[in-house]
């Protein structure tokens, strides 16, 4: 590290908050390009900050990333925050490392509920935001309205007068310009760099005292083991330096820091020493937990532990015990699933895992929401795991003898014509309309508060009701007494296969009148597997294996052609929302199958009589 990184007044630590798709990652790409942090020969991948495959595919940021930019002789550390409340555990820890936030808002959509969640945390910590109104060159931009909405949002979140007096800058991440007026259409990002340097305070840290820092996130690498990441709060750290680690319970142990790495661009560079205010990664201490304090052995003082939101949704993971178990995956045993879940717990703080005592093949996994858990399942199946997972359920807690359940704030953006059916559907699921604002261009925005269990399984239904044109965003709001009534249950029954084999077109053709199929000709099925949605509300056991009875009278080939409706192929999220309480989702690297918990019909009957 050069001398200028030691001058604490030249250091700025900021976090970026943005709603999905408002252009956060693209903006950071531009900042890296224009500051010259990427050297000429480095090929810059689009959306550099989304490093995980799933993040790129879904366009969401799950883990917070760090990147450092050198501009003139300032060093700016930018930390990316996950925009989604399901990853709330990440958000709070990230904000503890920075001195200000850039709130990125789309110039036509305005602030959204997911940004609200992170902004609320930032304001509560006393950070003063800089508002960046992005995509200013969109034809549908309405910066004045967006600014008013942002001000109202801050006011609703109890911002102080100083926080309400925020700076605003207009930018286009895609075309790489920024300016203080909303008429800006060319130039570069200099005004944004200048604003950050002028308005953000250098870190309030003590460069002289004995070393102390807190671990705010973890990474894992099979070569060096656990890597801790955090901001140095006091003093400096060198490679191979002895430290004392204090965990959140106050237990102490001694260790040594092996490597110290600073961030430069998107790379981690090994450095000899790092100073107060720097965001660093280090190796050599294992085990390590989030919220651990590292300090100089001569001055052992713990920092207050970081709080993490409690999980709100739970589901069961179990060994895949279907007839097709082990055909497609590499990891199929309880031990392998347990090791993988334990490894996930290292860096996924908002996750909780317990092995069931009555059935050690099953694990109860709890997280911040459906998305949080489905991302874990998707990652595991890509790594070669096979397992059965149950329907997500909300976690009911008891406070002073009253049962409470989680509620979510939902924002829905639909065309006027679909408004009625969406409001009706939300009503049947226990939703209460809080606010409604038409945009005057044929769309309307609806805000609801709804029990989380009413939202499970709603997204698929919502997309059908709005013919794919609706947008829906939800964020955990609060716990409140349980609302009477059952919501979110599937209305239709299912079609269940009665044997093992390959499905035949002739049989499927005759079953099409009974409902919509999940399987096509030649798909492998087994007894107890769900192969379609029944058009009525009861389950029906059917035979998809029955071929056509042939006689020797016919001319061959004249009546072979049967017209099959293409089967429904569900994504992981859709399947999790679809399954009922007596069903499991069989997840393997190649397929997602719905099945009954009891595969044989007489077992199901016995269980239903209970």
Name what the model sees in each region.
Residues 74, 98-101, 125-129, 163-166:
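Short glycine-/polar-rich loops that comprise or flank the Walker A/P-loop
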Residues 2-105, 109, 149, 218-221:
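P-loop NTPase switch module centered on the Walker A-proximal segment
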């Amino acid at each position: 590290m050069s001398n200028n990184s030691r001058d604490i007044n030249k250091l700025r630590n900021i976090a970026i908050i943005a709603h999905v798709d408002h252009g956060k990652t693209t903006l950071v790409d531009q900042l890296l390009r224009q500051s010259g942090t990427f050297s000429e020969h480095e090929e810059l991948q689009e959306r550099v900050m989304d490093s995980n495959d799933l993040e790129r595919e879904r366009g969401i940021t799950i883990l917070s990333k760090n990147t450092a930019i050198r501009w003139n002789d300032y060093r700016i550390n930018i930390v990316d925050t996950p925009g989604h409340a399901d990853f709330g555990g990440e958000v709070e820890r990230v904000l503890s490392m920075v001195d200000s936030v850039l709130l990125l808002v789309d110039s036509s959509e305005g602030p959204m509920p997911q940004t609200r969640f992170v902004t609320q945390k930032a304001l509560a910590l006393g950070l003063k935001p800089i508002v960046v109104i992005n995509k200013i060159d969109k034809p549908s931009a309405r910066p004045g309205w967006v600014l008013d909405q942002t001000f109202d949002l801050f006011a609703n979140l109890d911002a102080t007068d100083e926080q309400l007096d925020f700076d605003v800058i207009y930018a286009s991440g895609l075309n790489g310009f920024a300016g203080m007026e909303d008429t800006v259409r060319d130039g570069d990002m200099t005004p944004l760099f200048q604003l950050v340097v002028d308005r953000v305070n250098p870190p309030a840290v003590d460069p002289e005292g004995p070393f102390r820092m807190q671990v705010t996130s973890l990474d894992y690498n099979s070569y060096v083991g656990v890597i801790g990441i955090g901001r140095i709060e006091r003093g400096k750290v060198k490679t191979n330096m002895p430290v004392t680690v204090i965990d959140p319970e106050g237990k102490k142990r001694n260790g040594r820091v092996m490597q110290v790495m600073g961030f430069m661009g998107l790379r981690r560079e090994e450095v000899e020493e790092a100073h107060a205010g720097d965001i660093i990664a280090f190796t050599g201490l294992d085990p390590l937990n989030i919220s651990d304090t590292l300090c100089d052995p001569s001055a052992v003082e713990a920092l207050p532990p970081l709080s993490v939101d409690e999980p709100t949704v739970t589901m069961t993971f179990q060994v895949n015990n279907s007839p097709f178990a082990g055909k497609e995956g590499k990891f199929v045993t309880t031990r392998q699933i347990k090791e993988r879940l334990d490894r996930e717990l290292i860096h996924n703080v908002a996750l909780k895992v317990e092995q069931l005592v009555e059935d050690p093949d099953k694990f109860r996994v709890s997280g911040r929401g459906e998305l949080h858990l489905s991302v874990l399942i998707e990652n595991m199946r890509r790594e070669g795991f096979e397992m059965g997972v149950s329907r997500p359920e909300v976690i009911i807690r008891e406070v002073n003898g009253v049962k409470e359940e989680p509620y979510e704030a939902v924002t829905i953006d639909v065309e006027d014509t679909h408004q009625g059916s969406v409001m009706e559907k939300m009503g049947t699921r226990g939703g209460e309309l809080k606010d409604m604002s038409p945009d005057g261009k044929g769309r309307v925005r609806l805000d609801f508060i709804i029990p989380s269990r009413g939202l499970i399984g709603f997204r698929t239904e919502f997309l059908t009701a709005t013919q794919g044109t609706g947008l829906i965003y939800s964020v955990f709001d609060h716990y409140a007494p349980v609302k009477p009534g059952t919501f979110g249950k599937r209305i239709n029954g299912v079609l269940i296969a009665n044997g093992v084999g390959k499905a035949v077109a002739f049989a499927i053709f005759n079953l099409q009148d009974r409902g919509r199929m999940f399987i096509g000709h030649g798909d492998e099925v087994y007894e107890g597997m769900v192969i379609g949605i029944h058009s009525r509300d009861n389950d029906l056991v059917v035979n998809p294996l029955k071929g056509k009875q042939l006689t020797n009278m016919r001319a061959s080939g004249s009546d072979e052609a049967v017209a099959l409706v293409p089967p429904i192929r569900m994504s992981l999220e859709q399947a999790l929302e679809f399954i009922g309480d007596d069903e499991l989702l069989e997840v393997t690297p190649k397929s997602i199958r719905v099945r009954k918990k009891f595969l044989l019909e007489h077992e199901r009957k016995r269980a239903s009589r209970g």
